UniProtKB/Swiss-Prot annotation:
Protein species of origin: Arabidopsis thaliana
Residues the record lists as binding Zn(2+) 1: C137, C140, C159, C162
Zinc finger (RING-type): 137-187, 295-325
Lineage start: Eukaryota, Viridiplantae, Streptophyta, Embryophyta, Tracheophyta
Assigned keywords, A-Z: Metal-binding, Repeat, Transferase, Ubl conjugation pathway, Zinc, Zinc-finger
Binding residue positions for Zn(2+) 6: C322, C325, H332, C342
Annotated metabolic or biological route of this protein: Protein modification; protein ubiquitination
Record's catalysed reaction(s): [E2 ubiquitin-conjugating enzyme]-S-ubiquitinyl-L-cysteine + [acceptor protein]-L-lysine = [E2 ubiquitin-conjugating enzyme]-L-cysteine + [acceptor protein]-N(6)-ubiquitinyl-L-lysine
Tissue specificity comment: Ubiquitous.
Residue numbers binding Zn(2+) 4: C255, C258, H263, C268
Active site: C308
Cleavable signal peptide: none
Any one GO molecular-function label of the UniProt entry: ubiquitin-protein transferase activity
GO terms for biological process, alphabetical: protein ubiquitination
Name by which UniProt lists this protein: Probable E3 ubiquitin-protein ligase ARI7
Amino acid sequence: MDSEEDMLDAHDMESGEDDFYSGGTDDCNDSDDGEPDYGFVEEDADDSAMIASHRSQKNFCVLREEDIRRHQMDNIERVSVVLSITEVEASILLRHFHWSVGRVHDEWFADEERVRKTVGILESHVVPPSDDSELTCGICFDSYPPEKIASVSCGHPFCTTCWTGYISTTINDGPGCLMLRCPDPSCLAAVGHDMVDKLASEDEKEKYNRYFLRSYIEDNRKMKWCPAPGCDFAIDFVAGSGNYDVSCLCSFSFCWNCTEEAHRPVDCSTVSKWILKNSAESENMNWILANSKPCPRCKRPIEKNQGCMHMTCTPPCKYEFCWLCLGAWMDHGERTGGFYACNRYEVAKQEGQYDETERRREMAKNSLERYTHYYERWASNQTSRQKAMADLQQAQMQNLEKLSDKQCTPESQLKFILEAWLQIIECRRVLKWTYAYGYYLPEHEHAKRQFFEYLQGEAESGLERLHQCVEKDLVQFLIAEGPSKDFNDFRTKLAGLTSVTKNYFENLVKALENGLADVDSHAACSSKSTSSKSTGCSSKTRGKGKGSSRTGGSSRNPDDNL
């Protein structure tokens, strides 16, 4: 079976030029399975659901628990009807074949006997004796009347007490209970959920049903649970658009490919490296190398933050040495420069003895400063994003109702404020990851770095204008005594800033995902233009009359303006 990455890559190869924010299909009903519509937000859904689905793309659908159960039952009924088997047997088949109805049909009609044997569905059920004679339990070997004995399709008799203990143990052991077989070691007959419903306790039945529900998502390559803590929604993903960012109704956005938080415009490998770098010890070692020196005796790193050059290592070492030359302090004094200088160090430095050490320290310092620059801004945008999410919640819970009363405007006409906050939250996320992008952008590609920093700076400026408008300018209307004649102008301004900022950030994302290809194309055009001009000048020098003049003039094509 192909891996999930292979499936997604295949979709990517088949797709044309990616439209990253338009989604893949017009509706989730366009999927191959032809499953019923389970949309993003119902018409009577509350505002929070509407807000959470604001950026929902058409290449995925959010599934609630009731949606998942409905799909499970639909699949079970389809298999049961087509194969003329019970729903219990159909659920066992689907669970074995990872809830793929098509594969169940293919395997069953190709070799029904083999499938029955593999899955544990017997063609003919063994009927226990109908008389009143007692039966012996195959586990405890006690004799019981027929009403105290239970069995599955194989007919092996076990008392209800042993069955209950067997089922309880397997359920508490984990999801393996979904593949339960007859307790007889030589028998492979499957145990369905009907036996669980009959003999398990209420808590165990609830746990079994939870495993059963989760198996539908976890066994399906195009479905995943939302990774947000405490979220019970699942995502049904349709590959093909090249955009792997999905947004759950809980408001958490994540990457379908790596299940980390949504991270466009950087790819999954860059995110993995960045997260690892943020949590690894490499930057700690860089800091130690840049800001400390090892004790000459015990090699423990020591930081000098103030005072003279006389250093004393911590116990039990207690070695006294010079910070500059690392020599024993007993060899130092007024003749070597006193407490704040070291002649020995200056002489050795001039002779080049510390060149390699200083070079390493300088490299570590530069590396640390560069990382700190990008990390601080990455973290700052994350903090700003969290603050914007809190402000959005406050706008939903308090400000909209208050503003509606003050301005005599229905809340339905104030959604432009929520749209602005949503756009700010999204832009903060994008801006945050541009700093990871910039950190890994090769330093020798100067043109790309300049273009990137320009785009990033413009994005920050535009976002700040939008943020200030919705955060500061709105206050005057919240504290106003009554309707303000300037409110419509504010609405127009905020809606316009939201639209402009959205378009700019979409273009920024596309530019970065394309590797800033515009820089290369502009460089190529400039090179081509320069070459054409040079050729034109040569022709003009050698040629005669208007012909050579036109040759020179024709080299000025529209590319020259790029």
